[in-house]
Amino acid sequence: MTRIRRGGYVFVTWVGDHPPRHVHVYRGGRLLIKWDLERRQTIVGTAGPRLRDIIVALQEEERL
């Protein structure tokens, strides 16, 4: 399991998790979204521009 904190959010991924490759995003211990890392879109929930920017930055840094 990988856990990254940034911008008040916690990003969690699991090795071997079901497809598509995705990240779970939490804030205050509550799941906000599941984000498809391949298609760069939400699977569950709604992501605002700030959160999308953080996810893209983490992908560009190869952290996700």
Located regions from the model:
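Metal-centered catalytic cores of metalloenzymes
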Residues: 1-64
